[in-house]
Amino acid sequence: MSSSFFKKRLSPIKPGDPIDYKDVDLLKKFITDRGKILPRRLTGLTSKQQRDLTNAVKRARIIALLPFVNPEG
């Protein structure tokens, strides 16, 4: 079995850049077509960036900037 089952993506976020919950275009890059947050091994983010991203996505969902689930998939 090949070890490159998952394709690792290069992060569009630089280490010092803040992740803003109002930046919906950036957040959509880290969400699947069904609305799930991509894991860190696929996004290439640091652990702190992944935590900040998760909080930003959850906050954006609560204030209806992002859907909780995308049924169209």
UniProtKB/Swiss-Prot annotation:
Protein name: Small ribosomal subunit protein bS18
Function: Binds as a heterodimer with protein bS6 to the central domain of the 16S rRNA, where it helps stabilize the platform of the 30S subunit.
InterPro entries: Ribosomal_bS18, Ribosomal_bS18_CS, Ribosomal_bS18_sf
Disulfide bond residue pairs: none
Family: Belongs to the bacterial ribosomal protein bS18 family.
Organism name: Prochlorococcus marinus (strain MIT 9313)
Lineage: Bacteria, Bacillati, Cyanobacteriota, Cyanophyceae, Synechococcales
Keyword check for tRNA-binding: no
An example Gene Ontology CC term for this record: cytosolic small ribosomal subunit
GO MF term set: small ribosomal subunit rRNA binding; structural constituent of ribosome
Subunit structure: Part of the 30S ribosomal subunit. Forms a tight heterodimer with protein bS6.
Gene3D superfamilies named in the record: Ribosomal protein S18
Keyword DNA repair belongs to the record: no
GO biological process, one term: translation
Keywords: Ribonucleoprotein, Ribosomal protein, RNA-binding, rRNA-binding
